[in-house]
């Protein structure tokens, strides 16, 4: 059988999918689509030797992973600026119709509120829209994470937190991937991601690749190797209209994960560009279409 035993990590993800389809509780969720859901799943993915957990049993939108992460790192919250890069993944949540439905009738289209990037770079600052100057405001958690990894790598407090209770009511969508903790052991940087809500078909494949890439980027600027991505899921769910597509994915045998490297010596997390992030050896199977629940 093709690729037998070459990618046990991806099989962990596929086993989670099967477990949810077989054993999940049927829930009528916020979107009205309905899900099968389990609470409290965990998997570990190796990041050693440049490996990144970018699924191979379907094509994952790598450009979207990269551009969204760079957008987060900039502290940006404007879906239109991400869309201008050709990445439309936040367009639905930033649409006039969706913002109005959430009570944000006075907010410009595309303004998602103080979501991930704002919390990463300006935690605690007052949010005044996408174009305000937030320089020096709030806590730059991402810079603090990197400073601690460099200067206090044994700390148990190296945490990046997007769940700011004070700001939740201003967000177009509260954070699904809420908190990442980093740890340095034997010269390797590992990340543990807590995700309160995981759309296993569409969101989780993206999140695994994104936090795998973020860990590689932070390790690079800190002159460390990479270790592992530990992924903890709260509500892990399969949308009912994804079941057939995911059963098709379950029939596929994983190929080896690709690797990632960076062009040149990059010393600051803010200096990465899409062009400096190089993906190697990605050989996925055909895409599998699944509708996004908004």
From Swiss-Prot:
Residues at the active site: 176
Pathway: Pyrimidine metabolism; dTTP biosynthesis
A GO term from the CC aspect: cytosol
GO molecular function: thymidylate synthase activity
The keyword Methyltransferase appears for this protein: yes
Annotated keywords: Methyltransferase, Nucleotide biosynthesis, Transferase
Positions that bind (6R)-5,10-methylene-5,6,7,8-tetrahydrofolate: 199, 293
Family designation: Belongs to the thymidylate synthase family.
Assembly behavior: Homodimer.
Protein name: Thymidylate synthase
Any GO BP annotation: methylation
Binding site for dUMP: 30, 156-157, 196-199, 207, 237-239
Source domain of life: Eukaryota
EC number: 2.1.1.45
Record field: catalytic activity: dUMP + (6R)-5,10-methylene-5,6,7,8-tetrahydrofolate = 7,8-dihydrofolate + dTMP
Coiled-coil regions listed: none
Keyword Transport attached: no
